Structure formats: structure tokens, C-alpha cells
């Protein structure tokens, strides 16, 4: 009986330690410091304002045109839409004649190729804003891009976000997977900023 009560007491203590207890073993910075970096530097980094605005305008037109199409009702407000007519009327093409992609996933799906790692050319431009130390904690993902004549990616914009790991305490799991008193969770801070690199470099 005493053993059972001891176990229950330990479970209660583990639960009451807090659902948001921090785990900073992998970080030199605290979670609150990483959150501050996310709010300050997280967001969209635009390398080519002209092409970025072209894509923004084109995608707005495409979105409105797709809304007007009546596709097969999939239920739940979803429809299967054939976008061929939209692609013909509003092709995803820049003024330089190159096809653009709105995410790296779109490119990899269409080309069946994996994009190379982001080059130092783009990393250095981001670091001029974030600084070397803050960049170490950043998660950088390509957004708008096109492929040049040398089959190299030219990035128009990228997403920069910050994340940290927390340990949540409680009683988790099931009979199949087993039970545990804690689990790791990832929290993201995207910031919502927009940095136009060309404009900043002119200052």
C-alpha cells in the first residue's frame, strides 16, 4: 500500500512540476531568449522585391480564378478542381520568362529533384540582419524561387523561424506504446516580420 501511494505521489509531483517546464540542454540560450530572437528576426526575407511582388500579384489572381471554378464536391467545403485553365490564363511565370515555385516542396515534387543546401550567398545576407550568433538558432526554409539557365536555384524569398524544445510533464501513452511521465514538444516563433534585403543593402 505504501509503495502504491509513493508511486502516486511521484506521479502527482511530476504532473505538478508544470506543463511547460523548460528543457534547454541543447541550447546555450534560454527558451525566452530564443523567443525574443524569433520575434525580432523571424519572418520572410525577400531577396528580389520585383519578382516577389510579381508572384504575390500572380498568386492572388490564380487564387481568385480557382475560387470561381466548380469542381467535384469532396464534402466539408472542399472541391476537386482542375486548374489547367487557370494555369493557361495565369501561368506561374516571371517577367524573365522563368517558371517560379512558391515553395521548395512544389519544385521538388515537379522536378523530382532535391534542392541543394542553401548557399553562403544567401546565408550571409540573412546574417547581416540577424548576426552570426542569432543565425545559429534560426530555421531557414526556401519560399519563392526559380531555376536559372545553369540549373541552379535562385531564391526570391525565404522563411526564417526560431524553435525550442520543452518538456511537458504528465501521464502520456497507451497500452500499445507504453506509458511515460513526460514528452518533448517543439515550440515555434515565426515573428511575422518582412525584410527586403535589397532596400536594407542600399541604406
Where are the language model's segments positioned?
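N-terminal export/targeting and maturation segments
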Residues: 18-94, 98
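Alpha-helical context
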Residues: 14, 58, 121-122
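Sec-dependent bacterial lipoprotein signal peptides
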Residues: 1-19
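Short, well-ordered helical secondary-structure segments
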Residues: 3-6, 25, 122
Amino acid at each position: 500500500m505504501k509503495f502504491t501511494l509513493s508511486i502516486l505521489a511521484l506521479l502527482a509531483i511530476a504532473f505538478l512540476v508544470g506543463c511547460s517546464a523548460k528543457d534547454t540542454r541543447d541550447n546555450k540560450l534560454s527558451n525566452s531568449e530564443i523567443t525574443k530572437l524569433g520575434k525580432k528576426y523571424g519572418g520572410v526575407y525577400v531577396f528580389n522585391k520585383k519578382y516577389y511582388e510579381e508572384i504575390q500579384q500572380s498568386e492572388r489572381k490564380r487564387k481568385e480564378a480557382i475560387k470561381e471554378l466548380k469542381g467535384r464536391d469532396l464534402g466539408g467545403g472542399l472541391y476537386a478542381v482542375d486548374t489547367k485553365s487557370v494555369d493557361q490564363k495565369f501561368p506561374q511565370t516571371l517577367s524573365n520568362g522563368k517558371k517560379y515555385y512558391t515553395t521548395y516542396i512544389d519544385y521538388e515534387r515537379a522536378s523530382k529533384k532535391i534542392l541543394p543546401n542553401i548557399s553562403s550567398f544567401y546565408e550571409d545576407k540573412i546574417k547581416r540582419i540577424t548576426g552570426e550568433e542569432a543565425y545559429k538558432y534560426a530555421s531557414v526554409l526556401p519560399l519563392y524561387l526559380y531555376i536559372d539557365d545553369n540549373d541552379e536555384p535562385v531564391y526570391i524569398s525565404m522563411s526564417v523561424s526560431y524553435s525550442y524544445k520543452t518538456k511537458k510533464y504528465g501521464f502520456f501513452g497507451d497500452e500499445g506504446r507504453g506509458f511515460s511521465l513526460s514528452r518533448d514538444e517543439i515550440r515555434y516563433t515565426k515573428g511575422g516580420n518582412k525584410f527586403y534585403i535589397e532596400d536594407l543593402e542600399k541604406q
